[in-house]
């Protein structure tokens, strides 16, 4: 609070909107309309907290000042940019000046006493330069790129390892001067490439497109940590579950393509309490980050259902991965946090529960979240008419599998529950589920229970509704 009064923001003083948290914010709206002659008309406005346009003169000049203060710097894979830009390479003397500036900045970092040798720190910085060259080489000719390649370290793995150490070193308290040096290094590379000329008051917004391209997951982690150290605002687009696992879910925004628009979904303020956030972080972010790309979650109680459901769906000709359906067990994290999270992130969901007491409680939780709406319940809940998946599949014609695993002769009478208990004792619930799934694979689609076929159709309908 109070930073809106500093010198560089004075031209925007009529645009500030006071907010409840004590901060002043600028809300800038940019609209585009396609005219009949296919030209685009751009409309600019500054708005208040209610979304109403402020009455201002010289809006274009204010917008230019805002862009000058907050320029967007776009990082993307240099391979794609080379197809667009050609013949705009800085002259060789400029490259030599850049090399001297980089050398000065690296010596500046070395001058601070650390546990690393000078050579190690220089090698770590060399890896950082490689990373930035990877994204900013779009204006390089083939000859220039070969010259840059010759300068790179021969031992790249060692360079990346040292860079990881430098990351952790700079991230310690009191590392502000080092961050400034890195930012200077970053700005030097930007200007040397001729990509942008930054105003001295600029605080750039870094737009990073698919940083996982051509980077091994370990190197991606190191590079992402480096970018986190730069005192800049960042917007990153990615298709990488590895990268999502490095990012708090509160900072993730899902983009969903719909028939007429692209919708953006995020948790927002007050989205989850501390306990729910911890469970989601462990269950989804750390262990199933790629599930954030799914269109629909099929929530099941445990590992048994995961094995059986995936195999039976495949027997019916449904490829869940291609359809954007992810089977997720919820017993460890709790059902309510997962549904709450899925709703806020724009992910469709369906729950499969057992018929025992625990399953009935889970079903009651789902009905409560749906306000006991029968129509919505049909879309989001399937209850097994049996104690659990083992009892259900036994009744659906797979009793011979359980007898075989339990090693019970056909002529020995024994009730269903004891057979299943013995089979689990001789194997395990997951292994027994795999046996049933393999037998279902041998029998074909006719062996799949009708209840599960209907559930598959409902889940795919939910997923496809979010697909187009």
Positions of predicted regions on the chain:
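The start of beta-strands in P-loop NTPase/AAA+ ATPase cores
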Residues: 71, 204-205, 296, 349
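Glycine-rich phosphate-binding loops of NTPases
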Residues: 2-110, 367-374
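Conserved catalytic network of the ASCE P-loop NTPase/AAA+ motor domain
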Residues: 65-68, 192-201, 226-230, 290-292, ...
């Amino acid at each position: 609070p109070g930073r809106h009064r500093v010198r560089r923001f004075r031209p925007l003083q009529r645009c500030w909107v006071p907010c409840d948290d004590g901060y002043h914010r600028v809300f800038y709206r940019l609209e585009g309309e396609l005219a009949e002659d296919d030209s685009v008309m751009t409309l600019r406005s500054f708005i208040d907290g209610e979304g109403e346009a402020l009455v201002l003169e010289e809006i274009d000049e204010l917008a230019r000042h805002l862009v000058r203060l907050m320029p967007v710097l776009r990082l993307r894979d240099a391979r794609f940019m080379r197809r667009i830009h050609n013949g705009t390479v800085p002259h060789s003397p400029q490259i030599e000046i850049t090399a001297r500036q980089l050398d000065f900045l690296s010596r500046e970092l070395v001058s601070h006493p650390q546990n690393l040798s000078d050579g190690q720190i220089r090698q770590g910085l060399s890896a950082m330069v490689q990373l930035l060259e990877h994204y900013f080489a779009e204006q390089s000719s083939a000859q220039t790129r070969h010259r840059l390649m010759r300068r790179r370290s021969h031992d790249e793995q060692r360079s990346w390892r040292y860079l990881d150490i430098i990351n952790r070193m700079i991230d310690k308290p009191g590392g502000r001067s080092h961050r400034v040096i890195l930012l200077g290094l970053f700005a030097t590379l930007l200007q040397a490439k001729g990509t942008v000329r930054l105003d001295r008051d600029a605080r750039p917004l870094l737009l990073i497109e698919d940083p996982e391209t051509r980077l091994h997951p370990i190197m991606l982690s190191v590079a992402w940590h480096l970018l986190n150290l730069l005192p800049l605002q960042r917007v990153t687009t990615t298709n990488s579950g590895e990268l999502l696992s490095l990012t708090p879910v509160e900072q993730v925004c899902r983009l969903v393509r719909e028939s007429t628009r692209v919708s953006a979904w995020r948790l927002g303020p007050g989205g989850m309490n501390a306990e729910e956030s911890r469970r989601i972080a462990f269950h989804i972010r750390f262990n199933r980050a790629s599930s954030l790309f799914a269109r629909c979650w099929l929530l099941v109680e445990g590992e048994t259902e995961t094995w059986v459901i995936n195999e039976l769906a495949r027997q019916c000709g449904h490829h869940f991965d291609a359809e954007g359906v992810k089977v997720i067990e919820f017993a460890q994290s709790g059902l309510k946090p997962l549904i709450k999270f899925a709703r806020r992130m724009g992910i469709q969901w369906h729950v499969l529960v057992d018929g025992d007491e625990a399953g009935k409680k889970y079903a009651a939780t789902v009905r409560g979240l749906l306000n006991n709406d029968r129509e919505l319940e049909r879309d989001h809940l399937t209850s097994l008419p049996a104690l659990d998946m083992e009892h259900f599949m036994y009744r659906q014609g797979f009793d011979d599998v359980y007898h075989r695993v339990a090693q019970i002769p056909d002529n020995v009478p024994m009730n269903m529950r004891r057979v299943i208990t013995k089979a689990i004792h001789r194997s395990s619930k997951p292994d027994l589920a795999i046996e049933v799934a393999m037998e279902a694979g041998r029998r074909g689609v006719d062996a799949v229970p009708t209840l599960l076929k209907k559930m598959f159709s409902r889940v795919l309908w939910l997923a496809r509704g979010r697909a187009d």
